Amino acid sequence: MNPVQVGAAIASLRKKNNLTQAALARILCVSDKTVSKWETGQGYPEISLLPQLAAAFGVTVDNLLCGEYAGIAVIGNLHSDYIRNVDANPHPRGQANITSSTRYAGGSVSNITFNLSKIDPTIPLYAFGCVGNDADGSYILSRLQRHFIKTSGITSVNSPTGVNELISTPTDGVFLIRAAGANVMFDPQNIDVFSLTCRIAHFGRLTLFPRFWDQDEEYGCKLARVLHNLQEANIQTALSILANKQAPKSEQLALVLKYCDHVLMTAEALGSICNTTIGQEPLSDYTAIQSCMQQVLDLGVQKKVFVFIGDYIGFCLNKGGSFCSCRMKEVAPEEFVHQFGLADDISSGCLFGLYHNYPDIEILKFGLGVATVSVTSKYNDDGMRPKREIVQIINENPTND
C-alpha cells in the first residue's frame, strides 16, 4: 500500500475506535503531528510501531497494512499496447510509415486499476491476470507497481504477453490488431480467493480466458465456482459484458450470473442476450430496455444490472425493482478523442460508486463522468482525473435523469 492508503486505514481505524489523534499519539508515545502526517499520507509509521499501532486498534498488522475487506480486485486481460501513428491510410498493397510509437500497459486490468488509482489513491487495488516471461510482461508489472497496485495475483508464463497494436491513421481513425497471448493461459485456479480481503472483485473480458469456461461438475464451469467462493468470502462480485463476436453465450452466462452481485454491460450486449435489436438502432423509449434488464436479473443477478449506451446514457435496475436512467450531454464531435477502452472507463466509475455505496443514480452519473473525461480532448490531456475534478466535470455537463 502507498502512504495515502496506509494513512486512510489508520484514520478509519482510529475513528472506529473513538480515538482522537492526540489520544493515539499518547498510546504510541509520539506527537499528534506525527499521527497527522501518517493520516495525510506524508509518511509511513516506523516498523517498530506497527505491532503497537495494530494492538491499539484491535487488528492484526496485516489488517492494518492491507485493510480489512477493503479495496477492489480487478481480474481480466493484460496487454502491452503499442500506439503507432502512421503518415498514410492503409490500403491493400499500400505502404505507410510509422511516424511515432508509444507503449502503454493496457487491458481491462491496467485500464481500470490505473483509473481508480487516480480517482481515489486511498483505495487498495489488486490486479489478477496473466503475462509472459518477457519484456512486455515485465513492463506491465512495473507500471502497475509504480501505481502501488498489488501484482501478486498476476501469473507469469512461458508464452508471449498479449499485445494490442493500435494504428492511428491521418483520416481513417484507429485500427486495433490484437494478439491474446498469455491471456489464454489464465486459469481460475490462479485466483487465491481465500487470501483476498477486498470488498469487490470485478471480472472483465471473460471471453479471452477459455479455461474459465472449463466444465465444473458442481457449478457448471470454473468461473462460476470462483464467483461462488468469492461471495462465500463476503466479497461482492461484478462482471462486465461486452458485445462482440466472442461474447459469452446465453447458456454460459446462465451458469455464472447467479453468482454475480452486479453486472455492467453495453446495450449491444443486452440486446444479444435477450435476442432483440436493442443497441443496434435508436432507442425510442426505455420500456424495452427495462424489460430486457429484468430478464438479466431473472437469470440470477443478485443486486444490480447497469446498461450503457456509448458514453452518455446509462440505466440501472436493482433487485428491488427500482429503475433509473441518466443522460449526459453528448461530447461534441470536434472534442471527441477516441472510444477504445470506454467500457473500462465506465466500469471504473461504477466500481468507485459501488465501493462507496453511492445511490444508483449517482453511480450512473459518476460512470458517465469518468467516460466524459476519457473521450473528451479538453479533459483527458493528463489522463484520468481525481474524484473532485470528475464531480466538477459532471456539474459542467448537466445530466438529464
Task: Outline where the language-model segments fall.
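A short, Lys/Arg-rich alpha-helix, primarily the initiator
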Residues: 1-16
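Short alpha-helical DNA-recognition segment
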Residues: 18-37
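DNA major-groove recognition helix of helix-turn-helix/homeodomain DNA-binding modules
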Residues: 48-63
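Glycine-rich phosphate/adenosyl-contacting loop at the front of the ribokinase-like
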Residues: 63-128, 135-142, 331-340, 401
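Ribokinase/PfkB-type carbohydrate-kinase core domain
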Residues: 70-78, 141-156, 168-329, 381-401
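Conserved post-catalytic alpha-helical subdomain immediately downstream of the catalytic base
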Residues: 299-304, 330-398
